[in-house]
Amino acid sequence: MTTSPQEQAPDRPPARGAAQSQGHPRRWLILGVICLAQLTVLLDNTVLNVAIPSLTRAMDASTADIQWMINAYSLVQSGLLLTAGNAADRYGRKRMLIVGLVLFGVGSLVAGLAESPGRLIAARAGMGVGGALLLTTTLAVVMQIFTHEEQPRAIGIWAAVNSLGFAAGPLVGGFLLNHYWWGAVFLVNLPVVALAVAAVAAYVPESGNRLGERPDLVGAVLSTIGMASLVYAIISGPEHGWTSARVAASAASAVLVLGAFAYWERRIPHPMLDLDFFRNRRFTASVGGLVLITFGMGGALFLLTQYLQFVLGYGPLEAGLRTAPMALTVVALNFTGVAAKWSARMGSPRSIGLGMALMAAGLVSIATLTEHGYTGTLLGLVLIGAGTAVGSPVMSHAIMSSIPREKAGAGAGINGTLNEFGAGLGVAVLGAVLNARFAALVPVVASSLPAALAAAGSERERARITGAYSSGLETSLLVGAVAVLLGGLIAAALLHRADRGDRADGEDRADRGESGGRT
């Protein structure tokens, strides 16, 4: 099979050479194709939440069954992101993209026709395998087909599709459930998957590293177990308590296994994850910034969704609609190219600083303007969305451009893992702050807000409980704002330092070249 000029490009970003001077001639069409594949996966992340009441009635499912229906997907997907990215680099990104779509489609078919909770849980796990392949290969293909100058905008559109899927999931699910039975939320994926497979086969170019390196099977197993244990601890924390034996054991297992993974990756000649990436100043700064952006966004949405449902009394669908402005702001700024233009004018360090400052301002707005009703929340969501639109694509591009092109799949796996980790960390940390504040104000029945409200003997007691929860929400969001702002300043400073170092290195190379030419 012949390779295109884009596939023969050097390892490093084109800013350092002549690679990728021209993008793939059909790159924008290909971006639309891979975004269609991406949207299929992301819709499924939130669409199931709306179907929970119907599933509970139809299958007589227990609370544990429902939790596993939701969590099986995210556990498998999160655990396999690094492995999926490595597989895409090794066996071809187009091939793995098609495999991911097929697995996701088969899982959707089995889920839609499932007659028992166990079968549905297994199908959701299978969909998670396909989802991991899709999330990593799509970003790797974006880096392959676009020029260095176009990559930030392309990544912005790719990220906007992520937000669109998150916002549209409850709407699509609600529409389908109003007209069809619960299986429709899964079977609707099938025509989209079929269209995406045909389009990928026709338009997406193949790429990958076919150097014959031995697969890192031990690393794949360790990373999968470690990340799944970490995500399980984060998922279980809000329900079972962060100090419970279940959560502590899962977290301890994650630390031990991921430590063993890092040790193993250092010892072998062809690691799944090259830890030398973390010596790159730009890569390290972007990693920290991306974790903090998803920390603020994930934690805020988790807390705000509970506040809207338990305190203000909105149903799941309406609560989802009221948080949608954040995602829609991301979509608007990235699809129109406004965020990319701002970033190009300001440069990466300032873009990240501005993005994190906007996010922090949004968290403060939600925390302090609750007495103004939904207006303060809406302002905060728009600010968080604007900050995410400006900062997140810049950091994703910085991560991906710091990694050799032959390892783009691994870079996409790192990017996806950081998103999952940051969001989970936000839920864990900000949730713990809220619970501590809530327990201090309502010590008798502070195990959970629903339990406290159910045990309330009067309207006055209910008002005291909701007031305590609001106070806890304010405290946790302010803590998140401080963390995001400080993290943004540090990430911007580190990126600025990395830029200065790159310029100095370039000047040194130029000076040596001139000196060599004169001798």
Regions flagged by a language model, labelled:
Residues 2-202, 341, 346, 354, ...:
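Transmembrane-helix bundle of Major Facilitator Superfamily
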Residues 2-36, 42, 282, 456-519:
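Transmembrane-helix exit segments and adjacent C-terminal regions of multi-pass membrane proteins
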Residues 21-23, 149, 195-224, 266-284, ...:
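Flexible interhelical linker loops that connect adjacent transmembrane helices
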Residues 27-77, 81, 181, 218, ...:
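Transmembrane core module of solute transporters
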Residues 38, 74, 153-166, 216, ...:
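Small-residue-rich transmembrane alpha-helices and their cytosolic helix-loop interfaces
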Residues 92-101, 117-119, 137-138, 146-152, ...:
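C-terminal module of multi-pass small-molecule transporters
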Residues 151, 190-208, 224-235, 253-268, ...:
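C-terminal membrane-cytosol helix-exit motif in multi-pass small-molecule transporters
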Residues 178-190, 236-247, 315, 436-481:
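A membrane-interface helix-boundary motif in multi-pass transporters
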